[in-house]
Amino acid sequence: MTAMILDGRALAKTLREELRADIQAFVQTTGVTPSLAVVKIAGDPASERYTRTIRKGCEDIGIVFYDHTLPPDTTQAALEETLHALSFDRAVNGILLHLPLPPGFDSNRAIAQIDPHKDVDGVHPYNAGLLAMGQPTMVPNTPAGGMELLLRNHILIKGQRATVVGRSVVVGKPMALLLLQEHATVTIAHSRTKDLASVVREADIVVAATGKPGLITADMVRPGAVVVDFGVNVLGDGKVVGDVDFAGVAEIASAITPVPGGTGPVTNIMLLRNVLRAARLQGVGRGE
């Protein structure tokens, strides 16, 4: 068996065109162009690269982009003040705080300053609570992208056994809740799970989100399983790989996401889609 490749780049292209049309319709109806404010602390090259990617994506589909880069010596209070001000700024529809923050900063306190209706990363406790209650509004972008890949490729989820390996609040846990909402029977595994291989082997859908390259190997995956790999790991030679041994698992899985080119491209589109969703939630437009 050779797995079907769940191509994130191709899907992202389709989603981008759909979102572009939705934004144009929103602008025509409301007279408002959706906007995103990115808040970050200077000094992290990876954060700078990500900002450029998001800026380009916004400009491509018609979202106004604001860059709020704070100096490396900024304080917790200054960061919170910036987020608080943006939350009350009617010209800003979405707020994205680059995480993780540098050592010494309290990310929970910072996130709490973001208006939940502007929380396009889906990290505010209010939005996490809605997701847990089965009322998702602003969903974290990475798991939302993974679900989009499954649903758009007509992968059967209802009644299937799904194992999510990883329990982070931004990927593992929300992905488990999204699968549960689609009526899968979900198990969450993690670093302290006994006999991880046997737990994974029971799954019809395997989700890897651990940050450990090659953790999921072919002998751990049942034939015909669907595998979603959220891992992004840079090896010593510069090669980017996932948490799944792609070459081996692709021989026995029925479908698999590659790394790179799988969940990543869709994740960025989910962020931009949340900006439009935020604008709608805020009821912006004519007649305010």
From Swiss-Prot:
<feature type="binding site">
    <location>
        <position position="191"/>
    </location>
    <ligand>
        <name>NADP(+)</name>
    </ligand>
</feature>
<comment type="function">
    <text>Catalyzes the oxidation of 5,10-methylenetetrahydrofolate to 5,10-methenyltetrahydrofolate and then the hydrolysis of 5,10-methenyltetrahydrofolate to 10-formyltetrahydrofolate.</text>
</comment>
<dbReference type="Pfam" id="PF00763">
    <property type="entry name" value="THF_DHG_CYH"/>
</dbReference>
<dbReference type="GO" id="GO:0006164">
    <property type="term" value="P:purine nucleotide biosynthetic process"/>
</dbReference>
<dbReference type="GO" id="GO:0009086">
    <property type="term" value="P:methionine biosynthetic process"/>
</dbReference>
<dbReference type="InterPro" id="IPR000672">
    <property type="entry name" value="THF_DH/CycHdrlase"/>
</dbReference>
<dbReference type="InterPro" id="IPR020631">
    <property type="entry name" value="THF_DH/CycHdrlase_NAD-bd_dom"/>
</dbReference>
<comment type="subunit">
    <text>Homodimer.</text>
</comment>
<dbReference type="GO" id="GO:0004477">
    <property type="term" value="F:methenyltetrahydrofolate cyclohydrolase activity"/>
</dbReference>
<dbReference type="Pfam" id="PF02882">
    <property type="entry name" value="THF_DHG_CYH_C"/>
</dbReference>
<keyword id="KW-0521">NADP</keyword>
<keyword id="KW-0486">Methionine biosynthesis</keyword>
<keyword id="KW-0028">Amino-acid biosynthesis</keyword>
<dbReference type="GO" id="GO:0000105">
    <property type="term" value="P:L-histidine biosynthetic process"/>
</dbReference>
<keyword id="KW-0378">Hydrolase</keyword>
<comment type="similarity">
    <text>Belongs to the tetrahydrofolate dehydrogenase/cyclohydrolase family.</text>
</comment>
<dbReference type="GO" id="GO:0005829">
    <property type="term" value="C:cytosol"/>
</dbReference>
<keyword id="KW-0554">One-carbon metabolism</keyword>
<dbReference type="InterPro" id="IPR020630">
    <property type="entry name" value="THF_DH/CycHdrlase_cat_dom"/>
</dbReference>
<dbReference type="InterPro" id="IPR046346">
    <property type="entry name" value="Aminoacid_DH-like_N_sf"/>
</dbReference>
<keyword id="KW-0560">Oxidoreductase</keyword>
<dbReference type="GO" id="GO:0035999">
    <property type="term" value="P:tetrahydrofolate interconversion"/>
</dbReference>
<keyword id="KW-0658">Purine biosynthesis</keyword>
<feature type="binding site">
    <location>
        <position position="232"/>
    </location>
    <ligand>
        <name>NADP(+)</name>
    </ligand>
</feature>
<dbReference type="InterPro" id="IPR036291">
    <property type="entry name" value="NAD(P)-bd_dom_sf"/>
</dbReference>
<protein>
    <recommendedName>
        <fullName>Bifunctional protein FolD</fullName>
        <ecNumber>1.5.1.5</ecNumber>
        <ecNumber>3.5.4.9</ecNumber>
    </recommendedName>
</protein>
<comment type="pathway">
    <text>One-carbon metabolism; tetrahydrofolate interconversion.</text>
</comment>
<feature type="binding site">
    <location>
        <begin position="166"/>
        <end position="168"/>
    </location>
    <ligand>
        <name>NADP(+)</name>
    </ligand>
</feature>
<dbReference type="GO" id="GO:0004488">
    <property type="term" value="F:methylenetetrahydrofolate dehydrogenase (NADP+) activity"/>
</dbReference>
<keyword id="KW-0511">Multifunctional enzyme</keyword>
<keyword id="KW-0368">Histidine biosynthesis</keyword>
